[in-house]
């Protein structure tokens, strides 16, 4: 089962394709991406009932500062998440990671490695593009998703940028 990987693409895209191929091989954790057991994962929620409060800028700045010492993942859970502003337009989003967590619960760690983007030392997932998709996710599903990331990933700190409309 061969898959063509174009060498004229970003390193992230190449790594994502390699990880995806290894995930499909059966047991990716047997080959690579094992994580050491973490003591505790800190989950930091950033929330403001006031719109335009520069909350996202603050959350990103906090994430970058913490990422100097810890492995940090930033998740934007806002209805209008800043694509085109703070974040690029293209790439896999929180919606893709959430879908993957539903389908391949044991392999979320491998999928995340290919989905995350980087802002300096900070890792992040792009926000969902469609507000309806974000609103359709039940609180139990968000909780399970965050727990999966905490249990299966390398991240020691998760920063959740939470919207008041969620």
Model-derived regions, located:
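Structural signal for conserved beta-strand scaffold positions within catalytic alpha/beta enzyme cores
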Residues: 5-6, 48, 74-76, 124-126
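Short loop/turn elements that form and flank the Walker-type P-loop nucleotide-binding site
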Residues: 40, 119, 153-154
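Short acidic, S/G/P-rich loop/turn micro-motifs used as interaction or catalytic elements
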Residues: 51-54, 130-135, 164-166
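P-loop/Walker-type NTP enzyme "switch/lid" segment
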Residues: 77-150
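Conserved catalytic-core segment of NTP-binding enzymes
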Residues: 148-166
């Amino acid at each position: 089962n061969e898959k063509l990987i174009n060498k004229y693409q970003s390193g992230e895209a190449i790594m994502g394709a390699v990880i995806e191929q290894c995930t499909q091989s059966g047991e990716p954790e047997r080959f690579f991406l094992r994580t050491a057991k973490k003591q505790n994962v800190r989950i930091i929620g950033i929330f403001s009932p006031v719109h335009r409060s520069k909350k996202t800028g603050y959350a990103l700045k906090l994430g970058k500062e913490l990422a100097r010492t810890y492995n940090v993942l930033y998740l934007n859970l806002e209805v209008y998440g800043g694509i085109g502003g703070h974040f690029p337009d293209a790439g896999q989003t929180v919606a893709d990671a959430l879908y993957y967590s539903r389908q391949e619960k044991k392999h979320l760690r491998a999928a995340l490695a290919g989905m995350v983007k980087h802002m300096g030392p900070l890792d992040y997932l792009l926000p969902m593009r469609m507000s309806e998709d974000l609103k359709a996710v039940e609180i139990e599903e968000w909780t399970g998703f965050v727990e999966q990331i905490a249990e299966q990933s390398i991240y020691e700190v998760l920063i959740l940028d939470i919207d008041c409309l969620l």
